[in-house]
């Protein structure tokens, strides 16, 4: 009985029953889990990453034998102050790569295994056949002949050459950078490396097919590009060469000037041909010939001292759009670092970060097939830092932040980039607006047919000025007989010949501030205004009962191709003096006020006619326009008089202040003053009171009450 009771108690125990059910549920879950795992389907099988670029290393070309080409020392001073194209240039780059762990070569002896990031590409001498793809046989034989020349002969050829030097190792050394550049490009094209850096010398982009020049013996990049196109016709049909050396690569350009397989783009100082190599071939309007027309682009710096802002602007506005449209199979950078900050030859301020950013952008072209080949660069520290930044980006590092990302490009550079875009838009769709205004094609010159169905804006501006001055102040036209100019070129107050005191205002056609429609190119008339800088001076003179002559010099007459506003200004002022002003019986005091380029007419008149009896002062607002010297043909003392009686107001950033900060322009330019602001409208507003006070002083009409 007791046992029956115990059994019944156990069966009726709720805790025991719950425990049993939990265990059963757990066993069931385990069973279901096992069944689920055994039946789970494979959707994507495990596989190797389908990428080719990232796993590859960056190739590196370097060979100590390239340092054997050196200048023969003829004095102790050449030893302590070596030639800029110093053999140590490539050593310093190789050394900084090792110091930063990009290569593993603690002895700097050129070991074969460079580590996990870079792959050594053996350097070989280019063959004669490879060099002859670019250079003439005569040039090759001349460089080869230097091997057996005497010291005296080598010095003689160095003296005769165009900024080149020779020794007995020059020929052997010069074949190595050619061969190294070829092998660096081959390694990229064949997929053995993702990109490559050729640390080579002597440089090459100045070497023309028939002659050495500018420290260059053979054109390394041109030889490499020619041979790659020849040997890899299926995989490489188009090559883009980007030359960011501060000097124009005249040799490279000449090698491909008639070739549509190579797009050559060069960013360099030009400055009206004053900067080496100083040939017209470096001008921005040199676009190629024959099949190569449109495949040459020179982005010329009109001033020195350019930096990150200018190079980034050029890349964003010109280089990258052209590169994307060209779709190259290989990109080669002619990588001179003489635009780097600290290089005394280039005198520019490009930072290592900027070189990194430019490299990063070019990596986006040609599926990353990029080869960087050293050209110039003569500050050993600057060239090393810049090359390190480029190498890091090649390996895969993002570029460093730009030191001053908010800096604006120089105005002269912005204008030049616009000229390049307008010119190149003839060949490249990326520079043409797909929804442009159908009324005119602004890439074509304005001609009679366009004028016949459209109304030139500068004509409308002058007509508005004429109506205003006529309606408000009774101005009349002063005829310019036999001069092919608009009738309203010269306006004046009535009875001007009877005036004792005359203000003569000579100005360019007024500017317009306007919002432009980015799609159609039209301007928003409701928010557009004419900036008439001359009106304040006219009203000021009228308040004092002065006679006023207002001279408007058109920017262009459209019809004649050889029209020059500057020359027209000179002719008009001479005409006014010879036919009107010198015959005015009452005139005793004249003040000239020039605004813009047209002020050159005033300076021309003062040098060609003796007006000092009545001319009391000259005020010129030139903004960013070029200074015009007074050339005295009547009296050598005119320059001194002009300096004492003139005020020439320039932009704060005018080029005359950059050339030599410590020196003022010479007296023949007048008394040139640097304003605090830029832009004609701003400097006139800033210096209006100073200018008018100077006129009153010269007229001897100043009083304390005024």
From Swiss-Prot:
The active site is at residue 206. Residues 67-396 are annotated as: Histone deacetylase. Gene3D superfamilies: Histone deacetylase domain. It comes from the Eukaryota. It is an enzyme of class 3 (hydrolase). Its EC number is 3.5.1.98. Residues 1-36 are annotated as: Disordered. Keywords: Chromatin regulator, Hydrolase, Nucleus, Repressor, Transcription, Transcription regulation. It catalyses: N(6)-acetyl-L-lysyl-[histone] + H2O = L-lysyl-[histone] + acetate. GO terms for cellular component: HDA1 complex; histone deacetylase complex. This is Histone deacetylase HDA1. It comes from Saccharomyces cerevisiae (strain ATCC 204508 / S288c) (Baker's yeast).
């Amino acid at each position: 009985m007791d046992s029956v009771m115990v059994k019944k108690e156990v069966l009726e125990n709720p805790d025991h029953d719950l425990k049993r059910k939990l265990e059963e549920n757990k066993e069931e879950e385990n069973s279901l889990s096992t069944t689920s795992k055994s039946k789970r389907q494979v959707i994507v099988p495990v596989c190797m990453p389908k990428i080719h670029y990232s796993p590859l290393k960056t190739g590196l070309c370097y060979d100590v034998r390239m340092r054997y080409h050196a200048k023969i020392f003829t004095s102790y001073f050449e030893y302590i102050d070596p030639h800029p194209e110093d053999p140590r240039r490539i050593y310093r780059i190789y050394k900084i790569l090792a110091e930063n762990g990009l290569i593993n070569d603690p002895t700097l002896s050129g070991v074969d295994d460079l580590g996990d990031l870079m792959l050594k590409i053996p350097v070989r001498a280019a063959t004669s056949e490879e060099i002859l793809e670019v250079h003439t046989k005569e040039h090759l034989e001349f460089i080869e002949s230097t091997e057996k020349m005497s010291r005296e002969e080598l010095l003689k050829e160095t003296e005769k050459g165009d900024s080149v030097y020779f020794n007995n190792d020059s020929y052997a050394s010069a074949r190595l950078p050619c061969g190294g550049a070829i092998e660096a490009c081959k390694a990229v094209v064949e997929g053995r490396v993702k990109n490559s850096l050729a640390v080579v010398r002597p440089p090459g982009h100045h070497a023309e097919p028939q002659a050495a020049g500018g420290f260059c013996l053979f054109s390394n990049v041109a030889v490499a590009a020619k041979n790659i196109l020849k040997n890899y016709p299926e995989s490489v049909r188009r090559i883009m060469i980007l030359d960011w050396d501060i000097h124009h690569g005249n040799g490279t350009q000449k090698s491909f000037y008639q070739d549509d397989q190579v797009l050559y783009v060069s960013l360099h100082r030009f400055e009206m041909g004053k900067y080496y190599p100083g040939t017209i071939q470096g001008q921005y309007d040199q676009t190629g010939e024959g099949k190569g027309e449109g495949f040459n682009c020179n982005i010329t710096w009109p001033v020195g001292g350019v930096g990150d802002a200018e190079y980034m602007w050029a890349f964003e506005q010109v280089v990258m759009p052209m590169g994307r449209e060209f779709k190259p199979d290989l990109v080669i950078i002619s990588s001179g670092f003489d635009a780097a900050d600290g290089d005394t030859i280039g005198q520019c301020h490009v930072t290592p970060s900027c070189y990194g950013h430019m490299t990063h952008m070019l990596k986006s072209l040609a599926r990353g097939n990029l080869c960087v080949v050293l050209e110039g660069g003569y500050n050993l520290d600057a060239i090393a830092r810049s090359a390190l930044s480029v190498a890091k980006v090649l390996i895969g590092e993002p570029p460093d932040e730009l030191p001053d990302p908010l800096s604006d490009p120089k105005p002269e550079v912005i204008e030049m980039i616009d000229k390049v875009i307008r010119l190149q838009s003839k060949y490249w769709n990326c520079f043409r607006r797909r929804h442009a205004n159908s009324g005119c094609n602004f890439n074509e010159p304005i001609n009679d047919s366009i004028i016949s169905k459209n109304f030139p804006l500068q004509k409308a501006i002058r007509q508005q000025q004429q109506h205003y001055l006529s309606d408000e102040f009774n101005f009349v036209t002063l005829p310019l007989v036999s001069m092919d100019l608009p009738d309203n070129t010269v306006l004046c107050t009535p009875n001007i010949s009877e005036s004792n005191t005359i203000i003569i205002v000579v100005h360019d056609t007024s500017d317009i501030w306007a919002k432009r429609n980015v799609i159609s190119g039209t301007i928003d008339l409701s928010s557009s205004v004419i900036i008439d800088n001359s009106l304040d001076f006219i009203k000021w003179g009228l308040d004092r009962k002065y006679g006023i002559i207002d001279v408007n010099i058109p920017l262009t007459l459209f019809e004649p191709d050889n029209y020059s506003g500057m020359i027209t200004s000179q002719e008009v002022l001479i005409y006014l003096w010879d036919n009107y002003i010198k015959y005015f019986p009452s005139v005793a005091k004249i003040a000239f006020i020039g605004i813009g380029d047209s002020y050159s007419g005033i300076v021309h008149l003062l040098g060609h006619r003796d007006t000092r009896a009545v001319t009391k002062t000259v005020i010129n607002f030139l903004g960013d326009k070029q200074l015009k010297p007074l050339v005295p043909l009547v009296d050598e003392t005119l320059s001194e008089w002009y300096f004492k009686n003139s005020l020439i107001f320039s932009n704060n950033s005018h080029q005359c202040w950059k050339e030599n900060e410590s020196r003022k322009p010479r007296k023949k330019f007048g008394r040139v003053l640097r304003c605090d602001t830029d832009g004609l409208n701003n400097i006139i507003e800033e210096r209006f009171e100073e200018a008018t006070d100077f006129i009153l002083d010269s007229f001897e009409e100043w009083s304390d009450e005024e």
